[in-house]
Amino acid sequence: MAIIEQVGAREILDSRGNPTVEVEVALEDGTLTRAAVPSGASTGEHEAVELRDGDAERYGGKGVEKAVEAVLDEIGPELAGVDAIEQRVVDQKLVDLDGTPDKSRLGANAILGVSLAVAKAAAESVGLELFRYVGGPNAHVLPVPMMNILNGGAHADTGVDVQEFMIAPIGADSFSEAVRWGAETYHSLKSVLKAKGLATGLGDEGGFAPDLPSNREALDLIASAIEKAGYKLGRDIVLALDVAATEFYRDGAYHFEGSKRSAEQMAGYYGELLDAYPLVSIEDPLSEDDWDGWVRLTSEIGERVQLVGDDLFVTNPERLEEGISRRAGNALLVKVNQIGTLSETLDAVHLATSCGYKSMMSHRSGETEDTTIADLAVATGCGQIKTGAPARSERVAKYNQLLRIEETLGDAARYAGELAFPRFTPEA
């Protein structure tokens, strides 16, 4: 047994200089582990709720002392004496103790920190790496790194509407090779931008954030960078988008590239992009509550491209069930802090997989050095992870952890590669 002796918490900073929660769990056998909680810039309306202090005199109201107190005063005493191996028991206690549907009383940031720290403690106590503890003996698939190398939308102060332009090195033979290809393309993009006299400042997630006239211009620049780095666009490296359409949906219309567009017009735009570029994945192409638009879009282009629900599903099994029943989207974005416990996160991935939906593990724009999602990507075998550009330590930490896992697995390691995107046929 791995009995929980004490649960502690503190306020730390995330990668954007905002406070977040870090939780420590101590077991009776001497095990001590910690987990830090991420935070998003573009957050879905239906996400579990972070508890912030609201005191304008501290951190502009974004302090998390209340969440820390919730861990110390309520959650810690409740979990003392509980076996950390019983993850579902722990997570159910957290949900019951909070007592709200959106975890707003204790805060999803407090609850998630505890849930993840408990899992880490249990894994360490039994002598297993986290990916092996959560995923079992057969966890061996390394995900395709979806590297966000050009930022727009809420992640950058520019005229580019699409929030993330990603590259996916599907033609690599291993995860380590994929990381190298991505890093080389990232540096190539910097030189392409410099040659055109464009800014090379970075967005929240480490991608470049030049002010460009259109979203297509961003795709063209990335295509040039891929070729300049010596790789074949559409065979070695393909493209993906996070549109984050909820961010520019107002009054029943999409305010996109200087005009108001309907869901049908957005669908036509995406169809044109698919004809022009090797796109394998489009995340949040429509607003989080535009169910009818999502259904039509999935019917029109869902056989050609992965359509990922982030704000639409918010890693919530109930929202995902509704999407599956309506045939809206065909993939789930997995953000542990959207739902707030490890058990519920794993339930969402299992539901997606069992219904033929793909899953993509994801960071948030406000990250820490915590690498839990890297282990979860391998544990779930989801085959895809997005955790920013190959730059900024809070992003690179996840890639480095995956490199370690690949090394640990040795000959058993398998890189997901093009199999992660069954709707896409690579060029010869």
UniProtKB/Swiss-Prot annotation:
It is found in: Cytoplasm; Secreted; Cell surface. Its cofactor is Mg(2+). SMART domains: Enolase_C (SM01192), Enolase_N (SM01193). The keyword Magnesium applies. GO terms for molecular function: magnesium ion binding; phosphopyruvate hydratase activity. Keywords: Cytoplasm, Glycolysis, Lyase, Magnesium, Metal-binding, Secreted. GO terms for biological process: glycolytic process. One of its GO terms (cellular component) is phosphopyruvate hydratase complex. It comes from the Bacteria. It is an enzyme of class 4 (lyase). InterPro entries: Enolase (IPR000941), Enolase-like_C_sf (IPR036849), Enolase-like_N (IPR029017), Enolase_C (IPR020810), Enolase_CS (IPR020809), Enolase_N (IPR020811). It catalyses: (2R)-2-phosphoglycerate = phosphoenolpyruvate + H2O. Catalyzes the reversible conversion of 2-phosphoglycerate (2-PG) into phosphoenolpyruvate (PEP). It is essential for the degradation of carbohydrates via glycolysis. HAMAP family: Enolase (MF_00318). PANTHER family: ENOLASE. This is Enolase. The gene is eno.
